[in-house]
A protein has these predicted regions:
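ABC ATPase C-loop
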Residues: 145-146
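The feature captures the beta-strand-to-loop junction immediately N-terminal to the Walker
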Residues: 33-35
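Helix-to-loop junction immediately C-terminal to a conserved catalytic motif
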Residues: 48
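Catalytic Walker B motif of ABC-type/P-loop ATPase nucleotide-binding domains
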Residues: 153-157
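Conserved ABC ATPase signature
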Residues: 128-132, 136
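Conserved ABC transporter NBD signature motif
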Residues: 56-65, 76, 109-110, 116
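C-terminal boundary and immediately downstream tail of ABC-type ATPase nucleotide-binding domains
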Residues: 120, 203-210, 216-233
Length: 233
């Protein structure tokens, strides 16, 4: 599905990513965990063609993404929810979704399917998105990314600033997408927010991959203590 191999990226003369490698299989949830500024978001942006990488290879379904314009990446079946819930705040929930559906032949059918996944959004279909709660806005951002019916979904800190009840709803949505065979690569700073949904966790520190394990291995308290003591999360 997704292969990232020896990814290297510089900003000016500063190395941001240092030979990052990992694989993501169909229906798998992989979390990049690390503190702010570790390089996690740069990995997502590199996949989306928003940041150039100096060396390395990115493959999606055996197709090379390196050098592909960001405009064409979503057309290959890759959805992206950036940090900050970038919505059209002056538009309604429905209008935000319809923008995401503009290029879809079966837009109404897709919209109905998405709204059935997010009952809260269905209840607020005519509400101005800027008046939604933070959790509801995150749901809408996720729902809009699903308008292209992606095979791969990139999520940048999807639980940031959310109440526990909303975090639970976002996790349930991720698990439902996983059941449908969607692969998910997500970025988080808080380990407790993602362990219930992640199959694998990779810790990124100073642009390097320093640790990886299955979520079951990561739940081991001794392992957590060792890793957290090392990177200071």
């Amino acid at each position: 599905m997704l292969v990232v191999h020896n990814l290297v990226s510089y900003y000016a003369n500063i190395k941001i990513l240092n030979e990052i490698s990992f694989n993501l299989n169909q229906g798998q949830v992989l979390c990049l965990l690390g503190r702010n500024g570790a390089g996690k978001t740069t990995i997502l942006k590199s996949i989306m063609g928003l940041v150039d990488h100096t060396n390395g290879l990115i493959l999606f379904n055996d197709e090379k993404l390196s050098g592909v314009s960001a405009h064409f990446i979503p057309k290959k079946g890759i959805g992206y929810v950036p940090q900050g819930r970038r919505l059209f705040s002056e538009l309604t929930v429905e209008e935000n979704l319809e923008i995401g559906l503009l290029t879809r032949k079966k837009g109404e059918k897709t919209k109905e399917k998405i709204l059935n996944m997010f009952p809260k959004l269905k209840e607020r279909i005519n509400q101005i998105s800027g008046t939604l709660s933070g959790g509801e806005q995150q749901m809408l951002a996720l729902a809009r990314a699903l308008c292209i019916e992606p095979n791969l979904l990139l999520l940048d800190e999807p639980t940031e600033g959310l109440q526990p009840s909303m975090i639970s709803l976002i996790r349930n949505s991720i698990l439902e997408l996983k059941k449908q065979g969607v692969s998910i690569l997500l970025v988080e700073q808080r380990v407790e927010a993602i362990l219930p949904v992640a199959d694998e966790v990779i810790i990124i520190e100073n642009g390097s991959k320093i640790f990886s394990a299955s979520s079951k291995e990561f739940k081991n308290k001794a392992t957590l203590k060792k890793i957290y003591g090392f990177i200071g999360l």
